[in-house]
Amino acid sequence: MEESAIRKAAAQMMELHGNGAELAAASKADAMLNQGNIDGFYAWNRISAAINDLDRKAV
């Protein structure tokens, strides 16, 4: 997944989930791992990290 797609997904998650966006992304990463979807796991971990980064920049 390209960085621009990661950032877009992070912004969408923040819009949908507000302060719970990072937790929601982490939950999706866990679900991907439980399903054996390693690529999905890494993608959602990157989205979670991007949410954290955007949160820090917003402060």
Residue ranges and their predicted role:
Residues 1, 56-59:
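Short intrinsically disordered terminal tails
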Residues 1-20:
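N-terminal acidic leader/helix
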Residues 14-50, 54:
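Amphipathic, hydrophobic secondary-structure cores in small proteins
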